[in-house]
Amino acid sequence: MRHYEIVLLIHPDQSEQVPAMLERYKGMITAGGGKVHRVEDWGRRQLVYLIQKLAKAHYLCINIEASQAVMEEIEHAFKFNDAVLRHLTVVKKKAETGPSLMMRNVEREEARKAQQQEYAA
């Protein structure tokens, strides 16, 4: 089995369905004998360019270990899910379990905003 990193851009109006989508995809992976090593919800972020006339999207990052057959099934599910605007799958050499650079930036931004709110109060 190989290690993969999947980044999903979800339609911003479907943000409430993100946990259910994650559970469905996790179920597909574990049913095929794979493992989920890391799931990060980067939240709603600004897009660099418009995708389907949208300026924002909900970002997810999933690191998994799965077979090629499971990956084909998952990518097939991404293609037929209208809520998934874009997806990118990258083969990794080893399992990634620590926080990604993007997640560290998100946490840093949240800490900075919380600190600014404390100063404002």
Curated annotation (Swiss-Prot):
CDD domains with a match to the protein in the record: bS6
Region (Disordered): 102-121
SUPFAM superfamilies the UniProt entry points to: Ribosomal protein S6
Any one of the GO BP annotations: translation
Pfam families (UniProt xref): Ribosomal_S6
Gene3D superfamilies, A to Z: 3.30.70.60
GO cellular component, one term: cytosolic small ribosomal subunit
UniProtKB keywords: Ribonucleoprotein, Ribosomal protein, RNA-binding, rRNA-binding
Record's keyword annotation contains rRNA-binding: yes
Biased composition (Basic and acidic residues): 105-115
GO MF annotations in UniProt: small ribosomal subunit rRNA binding; structural constituent of ribosome
Role, per record: Binds together with bS18 to 16S ribosomal RNA.
NCBIfam families: S6
Xref: HAMAP family: Ribosomal_bS6 (MF_00360)
Family named by the database record: Belongs to the bacterial ribosomal protein bS6 family.
Name under which the protein is recorded: Small ribosomal subunit protein bS6
